[in-house]
Amino acid sequence: EKIFKTKIKTKDNEAFSSFLKDLKLYMLQHHPKIDIDYRIVEKTKNEEDMELRQTLIIESIIKQFFNFPYQNETQASIPREKLWINYEEKSKSNPKYPSDWVLRKEFAWKRDNRCCNRCGSTININEAYTNFVKEINDGGGYNFENIMTLCINCNKIVNSKNPNITISSLDLNDKLISFIK
């Protein structure tokens, strides 16, 4: 019986090590701007139920992802020679998006190296969400310095009114849960 228990324990340890390695690698590659604290691994080391332990670790990562401090800061500008004739005129605050909005969104996305400004995940133009440093309702304009590029998860977080609902709706939940073996 003792040998059998040792074999199971070794197999569990290998599976857990693989889970943790995959999780850390995923977060580093897909959300490089989010600094994750993995102390939860040590805190849960005596947990016998491996799936519960993995779930607790994932919950900790999701909470850290949600609570990661993000400041709406003025963004980098685009070189003047790349701007078009009526750029300044269409940058003024207006409740309606300017007719050149698609171009502005693409320029901001390229300026941000095709990445989410908050977490650093690589996104394609169709997945990119935009937010404003200073909201249009508050007098912000459509100039590049006011446009932020975000992924779907960070857009939900930045615009969150109810943290619990937002956390449960993040795509990141499903992705991380898929690492449980």
Feature-to-residue mapping (PLM):
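Generic detector of leucine side chains in alpha-helical contexts
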Residues: L20-L28, L52, L56, L83, ...
